[in-house]
């Protein structure tokens, strides 16, 4: 872990240090808010210049145009500036011209551009275009019966797109029965693989991606179980306790002595502290398990995740969401919003302060340096989210 991160130069939480960032109610100080807002404007200009040389054919949420549309939609929600809505609209139109008709997910497939477009058309009172996008989104489910189950390329990533639409419309535009049907397929698929590979006694559910049993949020068990425990998926109490809980507990047993988690079941190397692999993604599963099952050990494990992230989360890979400081900071915000412990808000603010010096630490340049999940757009999204910490949610993942 240590080789992949910069040593954390910051003192940990104490009340007097925290007063520079937020007051006793958790409201950011005007000075810190001003610093964040100025940096957002500065990075937006840089990002817009950089996007001129981005791949014109990448319409995805993860590295392409739909991700930039998601950022501008978020900035419109935070600041209320109609110019941001227009920017989101122009980028999502670009993304709709790049649909692959292969993957069905929000981040790496056609569901992202269609879901974001539906929401934008709705906000712009273009009802017919919004309905057209929703119809196409619902029909995506028929593309590939052998689709995997994980977040980036699988059924969970499709479910996020459906929930994203319903949440932003404030009504059930996607029928609950459609979402339930996909959820049932995910459960059946997990039971089937668990039986086939003799995991049943340890974990009633099991999932793989490219013949690997991944553990983390992006491709693995933690991301899938985080969703299966969501109230909006309506998994029955019986199945939550007989299938999901023991499977979550199996993941908990994989914890390294450090408090971090492996990338795959058979990986004994304690290396990665990323949202995609390791504690910064597993923490969401643990927090949701604590909310659903009310057992203290899930909270303790989540707090251990936060300690690992504080120590090893300022990554040399950069400032992004998937494997960077901004994505890792969201873990602190999730724990802050669960516990109201000011220590976690302070830690998120310190990681934001690291991001305020964007480009000055000698980090690696990502393959797509201005994108939502690998690059600058994700950092901007995080800095804007931090302005109202109680509303902050990891984009395209957290519900």
Curated annotation (Swiss-Prot):
Enzyme Commission number(s): 2.5.1.18
A UniProt-annotated Pfam family: LANC_like
Keyword NAD: no
GO molecular function term, any single one: low-density lipoprotein particle receptor binding
Function: Functions as a glutathione transferase. Catalyzes conjugation of the glutathione (GSH) to artificial substrates 1-chloro-2,4-dinitrobenzene (CDNB) and p-nitrophenyl acetate. Mitigates neuronal oxidative stress during normal postnatal development and in response to oxidative stresses probably through GSH antioxidant defense mechanism. May play a role in EPS8 signaling. Binds glutathione.
Enzyme class: transferase
Name this polypeptide is given: Glutathione S-transferase LANCL1
Organism lineage string: Eukaryota, Metazoa, Chordata, Craniata, Vertebrata
GO cellular component terms given for this protein: cytoplasm; plasma membrane
Key words, A-Z: Acetylation, Cell membrane, Cytoplasm, Membrane, Metal-binding, Transferase, Zinc
Catalytic activity: RX + glutathione = an S-substituted glutathione + a halide anion + H(+); 1-chloro-2,4-dinitrobenzene + glutathione = 2,4-dinitrophenyl-S-glutathione + chloride + H(+)
One of the protein's GO biological processes: peptide modification
UniProt record similarity statement: Belongs to the LanC-like protein family.
Chief localization: cytoplasm
Assembly and oligomerization: Interacts with the C-terminal of STOM. Interacts with the EPS8 SH3 domain. Interaction with EPS8 is inhibited by glutathione binding.
Tissue expression per record: Strongly expressed in the brain, testis and skeletal muscle. Expressed in the neurons of the cerebellum, the germinal cells of the seminiferous tubules in testis, in liver hepoatocytes and in cardiac myocytes.
Membrane topology: Peripheral membrane protein
Chain sites annotated for binding glutathione: 317, 364-367
Organism for this UniProt entry: Rattus norvegicus (Rat)
Positions with a binding annotation for Zn(2+): 276, 322-323
Modified residues (N6-acetyllysine): 142
UniProt keyword annotation of Transmembrane present: no
SMART domains on file: LANC_like
Localisation: Cytoplasm; Cell membrane
């Amino acid at each position: 872990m240590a080789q992949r991160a910069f040593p954390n130069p910051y003192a940990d939480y104490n009340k007097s240090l925290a007063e520079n960032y937020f007051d006793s109610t958790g409201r950011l100080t005007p000075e810190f808010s001003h610093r964040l807002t100025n940096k957002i404007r500065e990075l937006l200009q840089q990002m817009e210049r950089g996007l001129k040389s981005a791949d014109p054919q990448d319409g995805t949420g993860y590295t392409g145009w739909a991700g930039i549309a998601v950022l501008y939609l978020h900035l419109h929600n935070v600041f209320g500036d109609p110019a941001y809505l227009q920017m989101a609209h122009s980028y999502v139109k670009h993304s709709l011209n790049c649909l692959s008709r292969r993957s069905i997910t929000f981040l790496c497939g056609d569901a992202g551009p269609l879901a974001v477009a539906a929401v934008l058309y709705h906000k712009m009172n273009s009802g017919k275009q919004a309905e057209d996008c929703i119809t196409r989104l619902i029909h995506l489910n028929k593309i590939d019966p052998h689709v995997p189950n994980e977040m980036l390329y699988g059924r969970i990533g499709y479910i996020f797109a459906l929930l994203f639409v319903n949440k932003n419309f404030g009504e059930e535009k996607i029928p609950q029965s459609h979402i339930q049907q996909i959820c049932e397929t995910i459960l059946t698929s997990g039971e089937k693989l668990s039986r086939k590979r003799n995991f049943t006694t340890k974990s009633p559910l099991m999932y793989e991606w490219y013949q690997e049993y991944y553990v983390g949020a992006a491709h693995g068990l933690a991301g899938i179980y985080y969703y299966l425990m969501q109230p909006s998926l309506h998994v029955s109490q019986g199945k939550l306790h007989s299938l999901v809980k023991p499977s979550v507990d199996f993941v908990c047993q994989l914890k390294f002595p450090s408090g971090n988690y492996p990338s795959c079941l058979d990986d004994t190397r304690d290396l990665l502290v990323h949202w995609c692999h390791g504690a910064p993604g597993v923490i969401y599963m643990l927090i949701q398990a604590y909310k659903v099952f009310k057992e203290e050990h899930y909270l303790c494990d989540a707090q251990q995740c936060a300690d690992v992230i504080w120590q090893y989360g300022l990554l040399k890979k950069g400032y992004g969401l998937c494997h960077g400081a901004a994505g890792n900071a969201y873990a602190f915000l999730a724990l802050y919003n669960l516990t109201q412990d000011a220590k976690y808000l302070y830690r998120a603010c310190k990681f934001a302060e690291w991001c305020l010096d964007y480009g000055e630490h000698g980090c690696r340049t990502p393959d797509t340096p201005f994108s939502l999940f690998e690059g600058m757009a994700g950092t901007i999204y995080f800095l804007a989210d931090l302005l109202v910490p109680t509303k902050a949610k990891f984009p395209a993942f957290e519900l």
